């Protein structure tokens, strides 16, 4: 009886040729999968990408869409990528998460690219410079792109050419070429009209003027052009309004708006009233320019600096009406929006009954 041969011995006894023969007889290994490409579906565009998010960002150039909007009050800037938005938000927060690790530096930056530029500019190799080869020049630059842009001055021919069909314009820097490219691409209005803006800002301006969407307060039905104006207005309906206290020692005065607090500090504590009324015989001074503008209506009611609305006084309700929950029907009254002549001195005029515009901002 022949002795048993272990698996290890059997494998070790195989020659290299036997191993190749055995491999050929077995099942063929699967072919390596080709990397998938994400292709732009717009006509006359051959762009393709290896990542889906890259294609999404590219499609925004065709549609003009900027889906990532900054929600900070009064900002409203929009971006194609979420990374660009998160980088922009650092401007509002003041956060600078990228710190230079060089000894004795510790400078902070809000983007990684700014940190990289700082390192190259301050701590980079001073020997690595790009020197202009034109006779008699010898100017040196830290970036090759800067050298190419500089050499356009010697050749008098701009280096960067627009490749759009029928254009062919030349530019001295890539940033100017990129800015020019928006003229051909444009931003199409998505509200059903044929407007094409050359820049995103131009499209936003068109949207504000041609497609106005008034925003209404659901409490008092007052209308606003911007959402941040409505947000500021909603504070007037809050059950407890914010109170701003004067920070100066020993003062303790409080105001319901930051504007009135600033006006109080400038005029009362710092005695600064740089804005003077130039109307003949007046000479009143104000701490804030807006206060002067409101005051000017007293001398010239035709100025459209401030719209005065005469509201009808609120009707008094009886105790029985309040307890029963019955609301009597409101009487329609046409308010008189006309402003009286500034020269009228009759005490029975509406101007005598209303406080002067300057008194709307109480300065203590």
Swiss-Prot record:
Region listing for Disordered, in residue ranges: 299-364
Protein name as catalogued: Transcription factor IIIA
Protein role: Involved in ribosomal large subunit biogenesis. Binds the approximately 50 base pairs internal control region (ICR) of 5S ribosomal RNA genes. It is required for their RNA polymerase III-dependent transcription and may also maintain the transcription of other genes. Also binds the transcribed 5S RNA's.
GO cellular component terms attached to this protein's record: nucleoplasm
Compositional bias per record (Low complexity), positions renumbered to this chain: 338-352
InterPro entries from the UniProt entry: TFIIIA_Zfn-C2H2 (IPR054599), Zinc_finger_trans_reg (IPR051061), Znf_C2H2_sf (IPR036236), Znf_C2H2_type (IPR013087)
SMART domains tied to this protein: ZnF_C2H2
Intracellular or extracellular location(s): Nucleus
Chain intervals annotated as zinc finger (C2H2-type): 38-62, 68-92, 98-123, 130-154, 160-184, 187-211, 215-237, 244-269, 275-299
Organism: Mus musculus
GO BP: any one term: ribosomal large subunit biogenesis
Assigned keywords, A-Z: DNA-binding, Metal-binding, Nucleus, Repeat, Ribosome biogenesis, RNA-binding, Transcription, Transcription regulation, Zinc, Zinc-finger
GO terms for MF: 5S rRNA binding; DNA binding; zinc ion binding
């Amino acid at each position: 009886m022949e002795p048993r041969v272990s698996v290890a011995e059997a494998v070790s006894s195989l020659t290299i040729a036997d191993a190749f023969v055995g491999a050929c007889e077995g099942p063929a290994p699967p072919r390596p999968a080709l990397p998938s490409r994400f292709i732009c579906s717009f006509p006359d565009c051959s762009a393709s990408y290896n990542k889906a998010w890259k294609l999404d960002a590219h499609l925004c150039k065709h549609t003009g869409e900027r889906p990532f909007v900054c929600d900070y009050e009064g900002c409203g800037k929009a971006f194609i990528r979420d990374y660009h938005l998160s980088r922009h938000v650092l401007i509002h927060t003041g956060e600078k998460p990228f710190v230079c690790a060089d000894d004795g530096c510790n400078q902070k930056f809000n983007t990684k690219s700014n940190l990289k530029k700082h390192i190259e500019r301050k701590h980079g190799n001073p020997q690595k410079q790009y020197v202009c080869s034109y006779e008699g020049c010898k100017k040196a630059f830290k970036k090759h792109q800067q050298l190419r842009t500089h050499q356009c001055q010697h050749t008098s021919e701009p280096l960067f050419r627009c490749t759009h069909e029928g254009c062919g314009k030349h530019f001295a820097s890539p940033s100017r070429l990129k800015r020019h490219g928006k003229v051909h691409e444009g931003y199409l209005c998505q509200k059903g009209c044929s407007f094409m803006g050359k820049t995103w800002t131009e499209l936003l301006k068109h949207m504000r003027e041609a497609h106005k969407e008034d925003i209404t307060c659901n409490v008092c039905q007052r209308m606003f052009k911007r959402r941040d104006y409505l947000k500021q207005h909603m504070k007037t309906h809050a059950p407890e309004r914010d109170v701003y206290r004067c920070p100066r020692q020993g003062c303790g005065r409080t105001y319901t708006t930051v504007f009135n607090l600033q006006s109080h500090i400038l005029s009362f504590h710092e005695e600064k009233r740089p804005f003077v009324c130039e109307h003949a015989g007046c000479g009143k001074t104000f701490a804030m320019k807006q206060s002067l503008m409101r005051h000017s209506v007293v001398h010239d009611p035709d100025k459209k600096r401030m719209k005065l609305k005469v509201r009808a006084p609120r009707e008094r309700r009886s105790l029985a009406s309040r307890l029963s929950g019955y609301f009597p029907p409101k009487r329609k009254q046409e308010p008189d929006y006309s402003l009286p002549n500034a020269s009228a001195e009759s005490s029975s005029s509406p101007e005598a009954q209303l406080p002067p515009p300057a008194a709307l901002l109480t300065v203590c």
